């Protein structure tokens, strides 16, 4: 379900296939304003897509670094955790540490090369930067909690050492490698990666916050979940600009496939029961997140699921929570979010 590969019997000869695919991709690109080549792609102003530009400025205003996260109080908590809880957290961090690199590979290899709109390229460039911060943060968390070098190496190589992490990674990597899928299909697929594949794990870490555990881990989780929410919102915005969108059935197929993989990951392969969460409710939460994503993409819900976790009500994956707004207000001092017309030069400042 949701496999972007076509049946073997439907494939033409290799040379013919490459030619027809190239021609087809050129036609697709010329039909899509976002993908149409133009010398305008080298110059940002004047802004042609103000809503895309606003999202770039929001991403810029929410920038943070791994050094801002205080992990000094986490180790005493870590040492008091049960072995099941340590197992769950370390394996979730291993998944996350690998995932941000995969997201960046897609941005570098595909999206940044395909999209010709400078406003969107600015966003992707900044997303690559912040995904590197996320990857550094997860690696730092593993490095802090796991003292055994062999265990640490096992976690850092999760794509090779953990079959259930490999399954999620392979799904995402397949979309990067696929040359036959449309840009719209891949936008949906990576919205699913950041909006569905990450959602249950974010919720599990917020569950630890509800219990008053691991303040450094849970704070970094707040920062990263808000970033990923903004990235998911951006994918939905890009999707709305597409002329040739994939069909609703195709979108629902991709989303349902991601839901199935994520549910299996957190209820069978790495069950949230290890930290005291309810697996049935986690399945429901993943369905709720998927329905919300479908709505943002402009389609009807599949699951009609309610949010079963009250502690997630105030945790938005849309980049609009109190912390984000606090960051925006701080950066306002440096005019990061100001309109260019707001920048007035004066000589009457107090020194």
Swiss-Prot record:
Task: Give the subcellular location.
Answer: Cytoplasm; Nucleus
Cofactor binding description: Binds 2 iron ions per subunit.
Reaction catalyzed: a 2'-deoxyribonucleoside 5'-diphosphate + [thioredoxin]-disulfide + H2O = a ribonucleoside 5'-diphosphate + [thioredoxin]-dithiol
- Tell me which residues this entry annotates as catalytic: 138
Which GO CC annotations does the UniProt entry carry? cytosol; mitochondrion; nucleoplasm; ribonucleoside-diphosphate reductase complex
**Which Pfam family, any one, appears in the UniProt record?**
Ribonuc_red_sm
Self-association state and partner proteins as the record states = Heterotetramer with large (RRM1) subunit. Interacts with p53/TP53. Interacts with RRM1 in response to DNA damage.
Name this polypeptide is given: Ribonucleoside-diphosphate reductase subunit M2 B
Tell me the organism.
Answer: Mus musculus (Mouse)
